[in-house]
């Protein structure tokens, strides 16, 4: 299931304390994140909603199983950062594929094809942040 489909199914903003406005100043722990079923691994959504500066901000992580990808390369209107914290794989953005390991960070502008695949023998964890202003 694509993350976009998952987020649409979740409905409104996600964060620990319900408010009517943008995200308050807050620190998220893993236990606060919404666990979302995903066949490629463990998908956690920490936040999906408005912030002080963004109409919509989505922040989450995905622990990809060995050999897995969350979906084929795709595009969406939001800009996105992805940060690898565990494992090894490949990130694809705008026609370029790069091998990645912990500490790698990708920025991809909106409406550019991008994706990630776990090419290793252990899980690959990455955090993603995308927003619309």
Could you say what each language-model-derived stretch is?
Residues 58, 77-78, 110:
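Exposed loop/turn and edge beta-strand positions of beta-sandwich/beta-sheet ligand-binding modules
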Residues 65-68, 103, 111:
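Tight coil/turn sites that cap or link beta-strands
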Residues 63-64, 75-91:
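Short, conserved beta-strand element in jelly-roll/cupin
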Residues 45, 60-76:
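Conserved short histidine dyad/triad with adjacent acidic residue
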Residues 86, 94, 129-131:
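Cofactor-binding loop segments of dinucleotide-utilizing enzymes, especially the Rossmann-like FAD-
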Residues 96-109:
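Short acidic-glycine-tyrosine-enriched beta hairpin
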Residues 54, 110-133:
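Ligand-binding loop in jelly-roll beta-barrel domains
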């Amino acid at each position: 299931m694509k993350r976009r489909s998952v987020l649409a199914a979740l409905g409104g903003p996600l964060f620990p304390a319900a408010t009517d406005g943008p995200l308050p100043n807050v620190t998220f722990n893993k236990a606060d994140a919404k666990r979302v079923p995903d066949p490629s691994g463990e998908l956690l959504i920490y936040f999906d909603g408005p912030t002080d500066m963004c109409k919509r901000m989505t922040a989450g992580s995905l622990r990809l199983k060995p050999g897995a990808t969350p979906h084929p390369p795709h595009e969406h209107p939001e800009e996105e950062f992805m940060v690898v914290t565990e494992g090894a794989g490949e990130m694809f953005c705008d026609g370029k594929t790069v091998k990645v390991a912990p500490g790698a960070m990708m920025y991809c502008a909106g409406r550019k094809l991008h994706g990630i695949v776990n090419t290793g023998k252990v899980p690959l964890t990455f955090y993603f942040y995308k927003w619309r202003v």
